[in-house]
Amino acid sequence: MIASKFGIGQQVRHKLFGYLGVIIDVDPEYSLDKPYIDKIAADDSLRTAPWYHVVMEDEDGKPVHTYLAEAQLGYEAFLEHPEQPTLDELAESIRLQLQAPRLRN
């Protein structure tokens, strides 16, 4: 069983670029059809570690869906980000839905 370091609804930072993001899904290993760089195909430990669907914002504040390896992400220490309130709202909304899911008939 593969354990992931981060959970759905958690805010994270990209280690290299420092971008704030919110995890919206987790894959136990790389699951896209083709690796977007040759290193992923060659480095089995990177490919078989958890990968995350992360929503970030571009320079204009528009949401961007990214697919990142666990090694590319770090913990975010702060819960509030005045410069990116929509990501705070997204994270809170996801966490609330996970705590109290709506039942469908």
Swiss-Prot record:
The keyword Acetylation does not apply. The keyword Cytoplasm applies. GO terms for biological process: response to heat. GO terms for cellular component: cytoplasm. Keywords: Cytoplasm, Stress response. It comes from the Bacteria. InterPro entries: Hemimethylated_DNA-bd_dom, Hemimethylated_DNA-bd_sf, HspQ. It holds the Pfam family YccV-like. Involved in the degradation of certain denaturated proteins, including DnaA, during heat shock stress. Belongs to the HspQ family. This is Heat shock protein HspQ.
